[in-house]
A protein has these predicted regions:
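Short cysteine-rich clusters marking metal-coordination/redox-active sites
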Residues: 60-63, 88-91
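Membrane-interface, cytosolic juxtamembrane amphipathic helix immediately N-terminal to a transmembrane helix
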Residues: 91-101
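Short, flexible, mixed-charge glycine/proline-rich loop motifs
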Residues: 47-57, 77-83
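Cys/His-rich microdomains that often coordinate metals
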Residues: 66-69, 94-95
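Short, intrinsically disordered terminal segments enriched in charged and Pro/Gly residues
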Residues: 1-50, 101-148, 204-205, 209-210
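Sequence context of c-type cytochrome heme-c attachment sites
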Residues: 48, 70-72
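Juxtamembrane/disordered regions of integral membrane proteins
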Residues: 137-212
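Short linker/helix segments within small regulatory modules
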Residues: 74-85, 99-104
Length: 212
């Protein structure tokens, strides 16, 4: 698909935020267990004065429709369980998604276990998707970082990331009871979490410009 670069900012793996999603090992949990995915290509309307959340779009390469980015959200119950990609409610195809590097490594190593039933699992997954998108509402979705929401979201991110590191560290031989690890995890929760939340608040409250 071709996009008007004067109208849209195009997000691919080359964008630093998307690259963070690919390289952050903690996000493998989101993909493998929760089924949270992000598309290979997403768009931001630079000409709209609306907040970022309301001017982000996901293009379907199959039917070429631009979906409102809020189509896949926790409020609609569609943010998770997208293990095989993002389902397009318009044409019924699957919008290609990026994959976290750690997720890729885990899937490669465990392929002999799940490879046998991948095709049948995907078919069952596809059959369940139309019902999930029958009554979605995008206009009612609010920015979770709005007001003081960034504090809650920030601490939530810090706590979840710390828990994932507590699982990951022993695997690579790091003592989770060492002073250095404890200080690191507390800093991640008390400093990194709120900082992450505030940065996301600023990002989601950005508006475009009609002059763009």
């Amino acid at each position: 698909m071709n996009f008007d670069k004067n109208k849209y900012k195009i997000y691919t793996w080359k964008n630093w935020m998307v690259l963070h999603y690919i390289l952050n090992p903690g996000l493998a949990f989101n993909e493998l267990i929760l089924g949270q995915r992000i598309p290979k290509v997403s768009l931001e309307d630079k000409t709209s004065e609306k907040p970022f959340l309301e001017r982000s779009y996901v293009p379907c390469p199959h039917c070429e429709i631009l979906h409102d980015g809020r189509t896949w959200s926790t409020q609609n119950g569609t943010a998770f369980r997208n293990w095989f990609g993002l389902y397009c409610p318009n044409c019924g195809e699957v919008i290609p998604c990026l994959m976290n590097l750690t997720t890729s490594l885990i899937l490669i190593i465990t392929f002999p276990v799940w490879g046998w039933f991948k095709k049948s699992s995907k078919q069952r997954w596809l059959e369940k998707q139309p019902a999930r998108y029958k009554e979605i509402e995008v206009d009612q979705i609010e920015n979770p970082f709005e007001g003081y929401g960034w504090i809650k979201e920030g601490f939530g991110w810090g706590i979840l990331t710390s828990l994932l590191l507590l699982i990951f560290f022993p695997i690579i031989g790091i003592d989770i009871f060492s002073r250095q690890v404890i200080v690191t995890l507390l800093s991640l929760i008390l400093v990194g979490g709120p900082l992450f939340g505030f940065i996301m608040k600023l990002f989601f409250e950005q508006t475009g410009s009609k002059a763009a």
